[in-house]
């Protein structure tokens, strides 16, 4: 197994580096089970992404004029994703929302830090349960670990599977907004994001877009 380490200053930088490097470092295969069964994707075997200043604006990738590549996400979509992170409200067609698991845990983590002190390893927010494996499309984000160190709130994230092209920028922007909110409620500054996954991938229908955006396609 190859473990890739990527260090970036901000969220757009992290996205660009991951997209650029996956064509050299990724493993290409055909999906046997899961979303887009039968299609190909290229995937990091395991990746750790450290983002030192994730709050730097803009939070989402900026596509240069003339690149002829549609933006992978928008702040409007990020705000919709944030709502799914922090509230348990679920639409009829949805099998789950992250907020079902996170809503009460967010409040408890804030309370824990404010009332019991900053030096703890117990402020971890879990997503999913034993029944999640039976879902047709189980939750991709499986955990948000937190750490307050050097006066800042840091997030450590794990994704079991993660769409790099559009999911990565949307998810991290939404989680950054959540981290900023929690930091203000706790009374500390905003810190880093360290995200890891054994399934950060790009589907074959996005390969040409990704290669165009990163300058790999001439």
PLM ranges: what are they?
Residues 1-218:
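Terminal, non-catalytic protein-protein interaction segments that mediate quaternary/complex assembly
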């Amino acid at each position: 197994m190859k473990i890739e380490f990527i260090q970036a200053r901000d969220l757009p930088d992290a996205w660009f580096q991951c997209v650029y490097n996956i064509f050299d470092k990724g493993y290409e295969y055909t999906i046997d089970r899961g979303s887009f069964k039968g299609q190909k994707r290229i995937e990091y075997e395991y990746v750790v992404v450290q983002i030192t200043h994730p709050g730097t604006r803009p939070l989402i990738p900026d596509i240069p004029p003339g690149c002829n590549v549609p933006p992978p996400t928008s702040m409007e979509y990020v705000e919709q994703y944030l709502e799914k992170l922090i509230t348990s409200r679920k639409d009829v067609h949805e099998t789950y929302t992250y907020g079902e698991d996170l809503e009460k845990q967010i409040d408890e983590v804030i309370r824990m830090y404010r009332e019991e002190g900053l030096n703890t390893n117990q402020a971890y927010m879990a997503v999913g349960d034993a029944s999640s494996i039976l879902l047709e499309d189980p939750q991709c984000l499986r955990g948000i670990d937190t750490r307050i160190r050097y006066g800042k709130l840091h997030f450590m994230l794990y994704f079991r599977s993660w769409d790099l092209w559009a999911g990565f920028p949307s998810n991290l922007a939404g989680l950054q907004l959540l981290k900023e909110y929690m930091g203000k409620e706790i009374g500390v500054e905003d810190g880093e994001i360290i995200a890891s996954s054994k399934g950060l991938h790009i589907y074959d229908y996005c390969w040409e877009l990704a290669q165009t955006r990163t300058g790999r396609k001439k």
